[in-house]
């Protein structure tokens, strides 16, 4: 399993539906997958990044995709399309980085220096 390496500081979810675990939500939107499996059972303590929220595998608008990812337990949201108007809207409507994510990214930055 990709999350088992405790030395990994970052990991990424996928927009895959694991029907035996969560019939309604892709992994990126699934609290059950993120909280119960990745965080608790596997014990991943790093920053969890969503896959690109502009991918066609997701059926909602960008803001909804971002919020659903964060509410499920992702710490950061990946948006790769680079559309300025959409990026501005995301910045205005999606919550700021939480303390856990700020601390972990700061630790990672120090590690890179």
PLM feature spans:
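Second-shell residues forming the walls of enzyme active-site clefts
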Residues: 1-101, 107, 111
